[in-house]
Swiss-Prot record:
Gene Ontology molecular function terms on file: rRNA binding; structural constituent of ribosome; tRNA binding
Gene for this chain: rpsM
Keyword Oxidoreductase part of the UniProt annotation: no
Protein name stated in the entry: Small ribosomal subunit protein uS13
Organism: Shewanella amazonensis (strain ATCC BAA-1098 / SB2B)
Taxonomy, superkingdom: Bacteria
């Protein structure tokens, strides 16, 4: 198994699909990385040479991925909450942010129903 950005990449999958195992890399970015490194998208990871894997590592290192990206997202949410803006308040109350109705739906965001105590 190749290790890129601290993640074990599945070596039995095609390069584009295998790169999506890294948080922050989707199909589009994986295709761009393969194009930049001149690696065929349908080449399996186990068929790649060590030099090709090193070029993949260097190309992935140009992007914000994994822990850094998770930290950046959580800091953005924390910043919204500290500002006290509408989106920050919705985050703080665990409610939907983007105008969805909450009278009947939003169970995923709100969590399980809380019974009414008598």
């Amino acid at each position: 198994m190749a290790r890129i950005a601290g993640i074990n990449i599945p070596d039995h999958k095609h390069a584009v699909i295998a790169l999506t195992a890294i948080y922050g890399i989707g199909r589009t970015r994986a295709k761009a990385i393969c194009a930049a490194t001149a690696i065929a998208e349908d080449a399996k990871i186990k068929e790649l040479s060590e030099a090709q894997i090193d070029t993949l590592r260097e190309e992935v290192a140009k992007y914000t991925v994994e822990g850094d990206l998770r930290r950046e997202v959580s800091m953005n949410i924390k910043r919204l909450m500290d500002l006290g803006c509408y989106r920050g308040l919705r985050h703080r109350r665990s409610l939907p942010l983007r105008g969805q109705r909450t009278k009947t739906n939003a169970r995923t965001r709100k969590g399980p129903r809380k019974p009414i105590k008598k």
